[in-house]
Amino acid sequence: MSQKDNTVTSHDRREFLKAGGAVTAAMLAPTLLGGETQKTLPGLPSNPVTPKAMPTRNLGKTGYKVGIFSLGGQAALEKPNNETVAVPIIERALDLGVNYIDTSSIYGGPERWSEQYVGKVMAHRRSQAFLATKTKERTRDDSMRMIEKSLQLLQTDHVDLWQLHDVGTLYDVNQIFAKGGAMEALLEMKEQKVVRHLGLTGHYRPDALMEGIRRYPFDTILMAMNAGDPHHFSFNDALLPLAVERQMGIIGMKIPGRGRLLSNWIPQPIEVQKKMWEGMVLAPTPGTLTMREALYYTLSRPVSTVIIGCDSIAQLEENVSLAREFTPLSDAQVAEIVARAEPVAKPGLFFRFYERP
């Protein structure tokens, strides 16, 4: 079914307008000409290259077969005025068989460059990619504004996965599930078939994500899971088994820890690092792993896929090639990689070492 087959009732449209969805409603308006038929979502995306390009796994209970390597919305995709680099990376990813693209309403600052670049490709290749975005807002109304703008920038009338971004503390969870909280927006948009599935994401502490999972049966979880994880505030110990038990789609991120786990990473000068987000934990030396080791560690965990941002087409092609060649590591190999990651685990998990409310 094509996107043009979508229809929406006038009641649905009125409700979405109440939520501040004027722009999105305008995008859907042509379908109103078909009358009072119920809006339906198109079939799941399908990239015909994926099964030949890399192994696939079930994305939880969503019914989607996702390639084990997926494209993250940061790196080149979040840089300002970087269309000539970012858009070809996205196009090439789809050509290579990537069938899941991650982005967020906060990637690229107020201009939301990441969603802009992804949208330029989705305008003509929407049916080939499972499209995921996020809201970091904690209220219903602010999240409604976020999804409205996301749809506009992504040049689509629906997203396959809408996620609560960076759920780090119980304070976040309580805000999200409070009356007027962001969870209301997620449920409304799913009911109105503006979003297909719901998820949550996090990289700070496992307890908050576990509490979120207990409060609502989310379809997916996007969690930081690299070879440094077992050494500091581990997500592997309790969060990962809970997500597996709930049969969630599990998406791994922060695989190379912004490069800091990798032996070929060149540290920036310390004074430069201090001005960066990563600078909350300084990294004076390179890492200890190859990209193959870092990637295969996470893919040997019970994940559906991993998202990795790429700075160049060459980097993208290397990652897809590694995914194509993947075979699971033995327990002994996993233990050896974890042990070698220990000296650089804290810099590779820098996102777990800053103050949160």
Where are these regions (language model features)?
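Glycine-rich, proline-tolerant flexible connector loops at the mouths of alpha/beta enzymes
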Residues: 102-120, 170-171
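N-terminal amphipathic alpha-helix/helix-capping segment at the start of soluble metabolic enzymes
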Residues: 41-70
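N-terminal twin-arginine translocation
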Residues: 10-15, 25-46
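Structured C-terminal cap/extension of enzyme domains
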Residues: 237-357
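Conserved, mostly hydrophobic/aromatic
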Residues: 59, 71, 101, 118, ...
